[in-house]
C-alpha cells in the first residue's frame, strides 16, 4: 500500500486576499411580540406568523421532525392509566388530547385547550386547540381565526375569554406556556437557539 503524503501549505502572504472566502449565514431572529395600534391582540412575531414558521420547520426537516416527535413520544410514555375516557363529543380521549398538547409544547413551547363549561359550574368538554389559530388579547383572553393570513381568510377574529374557574360559563381558553426569561406574551421553543443551524 502506498504511503499518503501531505504537502504543507506555502507561507501565506498577508497582503494576498485572493484566497479569502467570506461565508455569511442567515440569522434566524428571535421574534418580537408587541402590541399594535388598532388591534385587540398581540402580534405573534413581526409578521404575526411565528407559529406557522415553527410548523414549517417541523414539517420541512426530517431530522428536526424525528427529534421533536421522538421527544414528544418519550414524554407521553404509556399515557394515562385510565386515559381512554372521551373528553368531548368528537370522541377525543384524555390520551389523545395529551399527545397533542405534548407535541405543541415541544414545537411551540406551550399549548391551548378549549374548556366548555356545563351547568352547575362543571367542566363539560375539553378540546385541543390548533396552536396557530389563537393570538393573545391585549387585556385578557384570546382571539381565534382559522388562518391569520388575511389573503386567505377575510373573517374577523373571534374573542374567547381566558380560563377562569371563578367564572364557569361558556367556552374559555386554558393556556400553558413554558417559562423563559424575557418573554411576556408568548413562549419560545427550547430549540430556538439552534434555528440558525
What are these regions (language model features)?
Residues 1-197:
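Structured, contiguous alpha/beta core segments that scaffold functional sites
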Amino acid at each position: 500500500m502506498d504511503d499518503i503524503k501531505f504537502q504543507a501549505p506555502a507561507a501565506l502572504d498577508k497582503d494576498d486576499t485572493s484566497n479569502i472566502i467570506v461565508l455569511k449565514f442567515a440569522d434566524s431572529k428571535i421574534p418580537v411580540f408587541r402590541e399594535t395600534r388598532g388591534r385587540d391582540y398581540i402580534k405573534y412575531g413581526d409578521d404575526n406568523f411565528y407559529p406557522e414558521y415553527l410548523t414549517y420547520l417541523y414539517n420541512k426537516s426530517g431530522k428536526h421532525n424525528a427529534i421533536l416527535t421522538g421527544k414528544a413520544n418519550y414524554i407521553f410514555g404509556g399515557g394515562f392509566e385510565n386515559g381512554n375516557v372521551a373528553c368531548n363529543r368528537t370522541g377525543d380521549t384524555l390520551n389523545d388530547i395529551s399527545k397533542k398538547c405534548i407535541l405543541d409544547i415541544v414545537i411551540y413551547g406551550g399549548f391551548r385547550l378549549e374548556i366548555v363549561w356545563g351547568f352547575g359550574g362543571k367542566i363539560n368538554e375539553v378540546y385541543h386547540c390548533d396552536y396557530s389559530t389563537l393570538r393573545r388579547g391585549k387585556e385578557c383572553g384570546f382571539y381565534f381565526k382559522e388562518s391569520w393570513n388575511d389573503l386567505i381568510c377575510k373573517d374577523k377574529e373571534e374573542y374567547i375569554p381566558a380560563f377562569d374557574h371563578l367564572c364557569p360559563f361558556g367556552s374559555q381558553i386554558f393556556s400553558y406556556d413554558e417559562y423563559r426569561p424575557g418573554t411576556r406574551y408568548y413562549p419560545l421553543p427550547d430549540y430556538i437557539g439552534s434555528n440558525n443551524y
